[in-house]
UniProtKB/Swiss-Prot annotation:
One of its GO terms (biological process) is protein complex oligomerization. Keywords: Amino-acid biosynthesis, Arginine biosynthesis, Cytoplasm, DNA-binding, Repressor, Transcription, Transcription regulation. It comes from Shewanella piezotolerans (strain WP3 / JCM 13877). This is Arginine repressor. PANTHER family: ARGININE REPRESSOR.
Length: 156
């Protein structure tokens, strides 16, 4: 008879598999945890863990509904792990668009607003995972784009 791994290992593995953003149902999470050696796991335990850690269902990059954990974020600074939340930076002739991990856009927009006009950012509008940046001067949008990319160490 296989013994169940301890609670700390379960929590660590649970968080790790949710970061993969590929599990759309609680039963898929149960199967994944059982595959990792947690033989005593069941749907009700998974449900309680999802609730305890504040997991939500959201769309992943493939537009599939999946469970994920909210980002554990502190005060925003350019040197903090916020750079890991920026997934894409693009622009057209009048606007820069930043795509982030789900739930991170408003926090990153707050950081961008705080650096403001001196760095070429007139203002931002943020949703859940997308930020629209209006540059101070459209003729210098390339400079503003490079500033945003360098803030988050983003490379194409």
């Amino acid at each position: 008879m296989q013994t169940s791994k301890n609670q700390d290992e379960l929590v660590k593995t649970f968080k790790s598999i949710l970061k993969e953003e590929r599990f759309g149902s609680q039963s898929e999470i149960v199967v994944a945890l059982q595959g990792e050696g947690f033989s005593n796991i069941n749907q009700s335990k998974v449900s309680r863990m999802l609730s305890k850690f504040g997991a939500v269902r959201t769309r992943n990059a493939k537009q599939q509904m999946v469970y994920c954990l909210p980002a554990e974020l502190g005060v925003p600074t350019a040197g903090s792990p916020l750079k890991n939340l920026v997934l894409d930076v693009d622009h057209n002739q009048s606007m820069i668009v930043v795509r982030t991990s789900p739930g991170a856009a408003q926090l990153i927009a707050r950081l961008l607003d705080s650096i403001g006009k001196p760095e070429g950012i007139l203002g931002t509008i943020a949703g859940d995972d997308t930020i629209f940046i209006s540059p101070s001067n459209i003729q210098q949008i390339e400079d503003t784009l490079e500033t945003v990319k360098s803030l988050f160490n983003y490379t194409d």
